[in-house]
Amino acid sequence: MIGTSAKHGWEVGLSRFTIKILWLNENVAIAVDQVVGKATSPLTAYYFWPRHDAWEQLKTELESKSWITEAERVELLNQATEVINYWQEEGKGKPLAQAQARFPELVFTGSN
């Protein structure tokens, strides 16, 4: 594993990227921002699950950016997988604060 984290097993994007999560009752959406200095710049759109195949859309978008290394893509996609699995298996309908506590290294926003 590249960049391991004791809590979840992944340290996202080697500090070059931030994963943003839109936590909703009926969907979860995932986007990636690039860290530029002390700010961030949107790198992808928000991709929604289960409305669409967010993981596959994110994978395609990341692969289109040749300057992102394979290790970084794998790391970002593994984190997306963890979030989607959590939302599907136990997080759907749970409060935003609970999801934030589960994934403190990610940026969350939402309606609940």
From Swiss-Prot:
Gene Ontology CC terms: ribonucleoprotein complex; ribosome
Keywords assigned: Ribonucleoprotein, Ribosomal protein
Keyword match Phosphoprotein: no
GO MF terms, alphabetically ordered: structural constituent of ribosome
Highest taxon listed in the record's lineage: Bacteria
Keyword DNA-binding: no
Stored InterPro entries: PSRP-3/Ycf65_sf (IPR038447), Ribosomal_PSRP3/Ycf65 (IPR006924)
Pfam name, any one: PSRP-3_Ycf65
Assembly with partners or alone: Part of the 30S ribosomal subunit.
Function: Probably a ribosomal protein or a ribosome-associated protein.
Protein name, per record: Probable small ribosomal subunit protein cS23
Gene field: mut3G
